[in-house]
């Protein structure tokens, strides 16, 4: 017996993996060899004593093992840093472990919820199945009982026919009759089939996945998918529950003036295909993206059994609610003071003296071009908000807006100039707005100052000052010397105290746009005076036809602020476009609401402009076209720095002209002159007027290439005068006749090659060859024309003086007689100008 008997040969064996070949079988006799390899996880056991050395060991060792050049303090510092790093790593590891634990708990919780849900679903399915089986069992029992009753009746009927001597059959041993075993056996078979079906269904969920046992077992190919099994279970559950139809929900459907079919279906919670089908049944071949009118949509809504709620497009503005503030919520607010008066009466200088800042230096020619909004704190601590309006005749609308948003009007009248046209206009604005007025008689330091004359002239406009037993306060001031400024501030504070101005700062902000402009670096910027509430950075708002989100708030000192309360003027950044001066700013809850309101207002404005420009009848259209034929137009483009200036220029242009010529503003806007403006001007043959703005480089190059004229202005008077002069050039010249002489015909001669020649005596003035003539017979004009020839004796002359005789022949006219009178005149063209 050798050593190898009964023993295996020694050899190497891989410890990391155990490969093996298995044969996988598929349908139709297909097979496939699969290599199955199972790997063991390698466990690394740390060596004894490992990890105990390291930086700490080196640090704890003697100085000979320490790196050269490192002191004890440096080594201690490094040790502390190393310990801190280790502590930080331990803390991070603990944090990661806690996060992982929390995630594991969350996964476990979700898994438990999923299992509970599946368990409830299985229980419901099991109850439904048991109920169905119970009903089936009862039905079969009833059928078996009916069969037994029928068999018993049949046996009873056949019993009398049988032989009476035959003994009845002995019952089979076992006691119970044989047919009674039938129902129990059928019931056991059904239970076994049910248990078998349940087992198959439970295992069928994973039957579509290949497992190792299936691969080694060599059983058939791929089974039904999990999704298929879920669909089958859902169908079985619905069948067991009897497919109970859900109760139809009646909805209140908001119906605008026009609605898209898909949106209508969405609001009714109905299928789009059903809505389209209903419309087609009504004879409307539409798709889901087409718009239908409100009446048709109402019929569809009623057909589907819902309620109709008709709404208007204007209802989008209902989100801007007028909140009635409670008395306990109101808090005192600073007064808003608007300074008004005639141009150059010292309004800005007066405010400059109050603010102790140089505002006048920034205005072109010392004339205010647009509204300035400032806040001033007096020596007594009172805060006043001032609005400085322009005094030009062109800025009527801006002064009107200033009066509408103000609490007190300070009417500035120069003591040496008294009441002027814009002073009267400011008085009317203040009366129309119903705000109290304080008269500031300025320039009292000038030698020609006469305050009593100002007070007397104000009486003509129903402004009775206190010095004349009235109720209007008047203060004599001098912006140059500072005289009377304290008295003016006291008068303003007294008037504000009488008014008891209050507002609620703890609500959504509402304000008025004082001015708006398009800044090159900041985009659309609006100067807003907050009237109630508090405007904060990040608020979503709608203002006129524009909307936006407050990106930044800048006060009158140029500083960024987080919020602005009542009576505080601020610049608002973040608009999507430049609003109109005078628009109301309202804060909304969402951007969608703001956008919807702005779009509605824009569409309403377009419809209004289209309706205003459209002729109502064909006769009106023809009449307008006939009038336009006789009118010459001067087209211009206007670009200004702020919205108020552009508006004032357009209004001034509309006033220029008469029945023969007018100025047409093709486009007015805010911001720099762009290449688009040049293209429009070139197509229309119009010049571009820039007010406090300039053209960019590309616009200048395009203007030079296309020959478009660009004019820059900083004072509105210069712009108006230039446009008026250009419009005057379109007027046809006026023809003026100057009578220079009379001549009487003494005799008529016939001259060959000339025709009839009149022998005349110049009785008055002078007769000129180049002048026009009229032939008068019995003081009736029978011919008007020119002279063919004018001779003295036989010589052709240019003119003949009074008392001399001459020969005259008319151009293309020979019906002349003795004693006719010739009237001699000259025509002169006189250039006309617009008033």
From Swiss-Prot:
Compositional bias (Basic and acidic residues): 86-152, 184-205
The name this protein goes by in its record: Translation initiation factor IF-2
Region feature (G1): 341-348
Entry-linked InterPro entries: EF-G-like_DII, IF2_assoc_dom_bac, IF2_II, IF2_N, P-loop_NTPase, Small_GTP-bd, T_Tr_GTP-bd_dom, TF_IF2_bacterial-like
Disulphide-bonded residues: none
Residues covered by region (G4): 442-445
Keyword list, A-Z: Cytoplasm, GTP-binding, Initiation factor, Nucleotide-binding, Protein biosynthesis
Region (G3): 388-391
Organism, as annotated: Ruegeria sp. (strain TM1040)
Family listed: Belongs to the TRAFAC class translation factor GTPase superfamily. Classic translation factor GTPase family. IF-2 subfamily.
Any one GO cellular component localisation term in the record: cytosol
Region (G2): 366-370
């Amino acid at each position: 017996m050798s050593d190898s008997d009964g023993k295996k040969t020694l050899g190497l064996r891989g410890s990391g993996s155990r490969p093996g070949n298995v044969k996988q079988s598929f349908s139709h006799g297909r097979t496939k060899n699969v290599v199955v390899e199972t790997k063991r996880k390698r466990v690394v056991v740390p060596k004894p004593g490992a990890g105990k050395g390291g930086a700490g060991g080196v640090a704890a060792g003697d100085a000979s093992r320490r790196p050269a050049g490192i002191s004890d303090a440096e080594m201690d510092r490094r040790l502390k840093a190393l310990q801190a790093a280790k502590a930080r790593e331990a803390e991070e590891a603990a944090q990661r472990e806690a996060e992982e634990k929390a995630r594991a708990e969350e996964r476990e919780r979700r898994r438990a919820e999923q299992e509970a849900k599946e368990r409830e679903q299985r229980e419901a399915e099991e109850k439904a199945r048991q109920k169905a089986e119970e009903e089936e069992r009862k039905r079969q029992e009833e059928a078996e009982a009916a069969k037994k009753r029928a068999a018993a009746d049949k046996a009873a009927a056949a019993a009398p026919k049988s032989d009476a001597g035959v003994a009845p059959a002995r019952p089979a041993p076992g006691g119970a009759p044989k047919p009674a075993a039938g129902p129990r056996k059928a019931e056991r078979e059904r239970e076994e089939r049910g248990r078998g079906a349940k087992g198959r269904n439970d295992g069928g969920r994973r039957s579509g996945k290949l497992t190792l046992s299936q691969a080694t077992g060599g059983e058939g190919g791929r089974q039904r998918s999990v999704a298929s099994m879920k669909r089958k279970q859902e169908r079985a559950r619905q069948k067991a529950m009897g497919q109970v139809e859900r109760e139809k929900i009646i909805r209140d459907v908001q119906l605008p003036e026009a609605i898209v079919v898909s949106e209508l279906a969405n609001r009714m919670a109905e299928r789009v295909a059903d809505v389209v089908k209903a419309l087609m049944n009504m004879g409307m071949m539409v798709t889901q993206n087409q718009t239908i009118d409100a009446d048709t949509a109402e019929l569809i809504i009623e057909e589907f059994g819902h309620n109709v709620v008709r709404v208007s497009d204007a209802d989008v503005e209902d989100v801007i609610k007028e909140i009635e503030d409670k008395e306990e919520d109101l808090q005192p607010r600073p007064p808003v003071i608007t300074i008004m008066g005639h141009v150059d009466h010292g309004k800005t200088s007066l405010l400059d003296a109050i603010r102790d800042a140089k505002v006048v230096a920034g205005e072109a020619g010392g004339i205010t071009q647009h509204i300035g909004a400032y806040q001033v704190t007096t020596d007594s601590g009172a805060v006043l908000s001032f609005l400085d309006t322009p005094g030009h005749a062109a800025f009527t609308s801006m002064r009107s807006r200033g009066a509408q948003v103000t609490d007190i009007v300070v009417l500035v009248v120069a003591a040496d100039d008294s009441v002027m046209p814009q002073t009267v206009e400011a008085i009317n604005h203040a009366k129309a707005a119903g705000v109290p007025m304080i008269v500031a008689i300025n320039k009292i330091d000038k030698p020609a100052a006469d305050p009593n004359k100002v007070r007397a002239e104000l009486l003509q406009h129903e402004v009775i000052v206190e010095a004349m037993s009235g109720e209007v306060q008047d203060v004599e001031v001098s912006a140059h010397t500072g005289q009377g400024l304290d008295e003016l501030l006291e008068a303003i504070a007294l008037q504000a105290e009488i008014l008891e101005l209050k507002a609620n700062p703890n609500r959504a902000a509402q304000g008025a746009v004082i001015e708006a402009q398009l800044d090159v670096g900041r985009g659309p910027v609006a100067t807003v005076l907050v009237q109630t509430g508090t405007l904060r950075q990040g608020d979503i708002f709608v203002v006129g036809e524009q909307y936006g989100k407050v990106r930044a708030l800048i006060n009158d000192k140029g500083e960024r602020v987080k919020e602005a309360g009542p009576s505080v003027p601020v610049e608002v950044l973040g608009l999507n476009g430049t609003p109109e001066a005078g628009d109301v700013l309202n804060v909304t809850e969402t951007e969608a609401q703001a956008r919807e309101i702005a779009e509605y207002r824009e569409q309403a404005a377009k419809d209004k402009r289209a309706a205003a420009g459209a002729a109502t009848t064909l006769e009106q259209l023809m009449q307008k076209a006939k009038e336009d034929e006789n009118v010459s137009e001067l087209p211009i483009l206007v670009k200004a720095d702020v919205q108020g200036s552009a508006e004032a220029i357009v209004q001034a242009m509309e006033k220029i002209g008469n029945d023969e010529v007018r100025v047409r503003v093709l486009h007015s806007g805010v911001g720099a002159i762009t290449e688009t403006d040049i293209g429009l001007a070139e197509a229309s043959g119009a010049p571009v007027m820039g007010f406090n703005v300039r053209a960019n480089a590309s616009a200048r190059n395009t203007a030079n290439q296309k020959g478009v004229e660009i004019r820059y202005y900083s004072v509105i008077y210069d712009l108006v005068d230039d446009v008026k002069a250009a419009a005057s050039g379109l007027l046809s010249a006026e023809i003026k006749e100057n009578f220079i002489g009379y001549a009487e015909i003494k005799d008529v001669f016939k001259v060959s090659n000339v025709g009839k020649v009149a022998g005349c005596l110049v009785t008055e003035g002078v007769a000129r060859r180049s002048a026009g003539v009229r032939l008068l017979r019995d003081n009736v004009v029978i011919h008007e024309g020119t002279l063919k020839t004018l001779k003295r004796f036989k010589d052709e002359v240019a003119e003949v003086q009074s008392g001399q005789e001459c020969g005259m022949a008319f151009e293309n006219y020979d019906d002349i007689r003795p004693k006719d009178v010739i009237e001699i005149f000259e025509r002169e063209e006189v250039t006309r100008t617009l008033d």
